[in-house]
A protein has these predicted regions:
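Positively charged n-region of N-terminal signal peptides that target proteins for export
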Residues: 1-4
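Formylglycine-dependent sulfatase
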Residues: 12, 19-394, 401, 405-437
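Bacterial N-terminal signal peptides
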Residues: 6-16
């Protein structure tokens, strides 16, 4: 009898700690730069060729309500930590809070036995003065362009695993970032891995250098936004093809989203050392729409979100589930079977149950903030909480996003239907009990 109990105990212990292949997927997290929903054909976009991303949506789940912060640095802070930027005292642009370095999705992946890598954009430290920064945040391998140090596209200035990458002066940066991750996946095909592609595309070329960065070979102008969108789609396609060739696609969780909305202007060329821009309009569902990056309008915060995970997600699905940038860390944690430590102050909710078809939504509200949000109600456009339909700014303006998506008709306090009044009360309570909590 004692032998039987021992065997049963061993079985139970093993079954509680050993995850099946489907429970330990590889993860490919792709964060495009400056890409709103209107850029992708699968969201009704008509201005840019995004055939590979459109196909990805057909093979997985497309989220109608994916949101980011209105600019890149706050989004990256929230994505990595699962916490909203104001909760971390608004980390200075180009920085990361020191006491959070051990609390990122990459650190969770390492705890779960994953190999980790990042390529593309960092913007959380100057690589030349802090070469180990990505490693301290959990990324064992890295290939990142030198933000404020050199170009990201042509004649790129890239730090590879903490050392300046030599002999790449005639290369195209995005090709190198993509190939770096393909090589990483090949090397680790027999073990679980997390590859984070923080894309340079479709951000313009500017790096705040003393001299304008170079044009593409043979051109007297910079790549247009349309050309960059096509390149973005091509680079994503290269990664997806690599997963197929390595026979890893079935059990790889691929997430594609954007860090903020599309820019208001696109860079065309430089004259006398100054960059020249023109307004950027994109066509979506028959409407010409100017980008809204840095604003809290939908054009600044509503981004594509596509998830493919063949072992779990049925193809061709769409969902109205709400997702903001705090939700990715808990989602990856659940997919990896790695609990988030209770000491981590994570705001988000895992949307794995949505992917599995167990629920229609993982949360009732989402949040976005501008750089100025400090809980001061006198400042307009600093933050909002919202549902799919109703959007309440911290200054008290309420909008019905089903009938006023461009926010032309604010519903003032005491006005509107009973449904609008109920939504205001509910969302104000979220501000008071969730956002402003100590």
């Amino acid at each position: 009898m004692s032998r039987l109990l021992t065997v049963l105990l061993v079985f139970l212990l093993c079954s509680g700690t050993t995850l099946s292949a489907a429970d330990r997927p590889n993860i490919l997290m792709i964060l495009a730069d400056d890409v709103g929903q209107e850029v992708l054909g699968c969201y009704g976009g008509e201005s840019y060729p995004t055939l590979r991303l459109d196909q990805l949506a057909k093979e997985g789940m497309k989220f109608h309500h994916g949101y980011a912060m209105p600019s890149c640095h706050p989004t990256r802070i929230t994505l990595l930590t699962g916490q909203y930027p104001f909760r971390l005292d608004h980390p200075r642009w180009g920085s990361f809070p020191k006491d959070q370095e051990g609390e990122t999705f990459a650190q969770l992946a390492k705890k779960a036995g994953y190999k980790t890598a990042i390529a593309g954009k960092w913007q959380l430290a100057l690589q030349g003065t802090d070469r180990k920064h990505p490693e301290r945040l959990g990324f064992e391998q890295s290939a990142l362009f030198g933000w404020h140090e050199g170009a990201r596209y042509w004649e790129p200035y890239i730090w590879k695993n903490g050392e300046l990458w030599k002999g790449i002066e005639d290369k195209y940066g995005p090709d190198l970032y993509t190939q770096f991750l393909i090589d990483f996946m090949k090397t680790n095909r027999d073990r679980p891995f997390l590859a984070y592609y923080s894309m340079a595309l479709c951000h313009d070329v500017t790096d705040d250098l003393d001299e304008p960065v170079p044009y593409a070979p043979g051109k007297d102008r910079y790549d247009s936004y349309a050309e960059m969108a096509a390149e973005m789609d091509r680079e994503v396609g290269r990664l997806l093809d690599a997963l197929d060739e390595l026979k890893l696609a079935e059990n790889t969780l691929v997430i594609f989203t954007g860090d903020n909305g599309t820019p208001m202007k696109e860079l065309t060329h430089h004259e006398n050392g100054k960059y020249i821009r023109k307004p950027l309009f994109s066509k979506i569902d028959g409407e010409m729409l100017q980008g809204g990056k840095t604003t809290l309008y939908d054009t600044g915060t509503r981004v594509p979100l596509i998830v493919r995970w063949p072992a779990v997600v049925k193809p061709g699905q769409t969902t109205d589930a709400l997702v903001d940038m705090s939700d990715y860390l808990p989602t990856m944690a659940e997919a990896m079977g790695q609990p988030v430590p209770s000491s981590w102050q994570v705001e988000g909710k895992s949307f794995v149950p949505v992917l599995k078809g167990e629920t229609d939504t993982a949360r009732e509200w989402i949040f976005a903030q501008g750089r100025a949000f400090e809980g001061d109600p006198s400042k307009k456009n600093t933050a909002w909480v919202r549902t799919a339909r109703w959007k309440l700014y911290f200054d008290g303006r309420l909008f019905d996003m089903e009938n006023d998506v461009r926010e032309k008709k604010p519903i003032e306090p005491g006005e509107g239907s009973a449904e609008a009044k109920h939504a205001r009360q509910k969302l104000r309570q979220v501000f008071e009990t969730e956002i402003l909590r100590k």
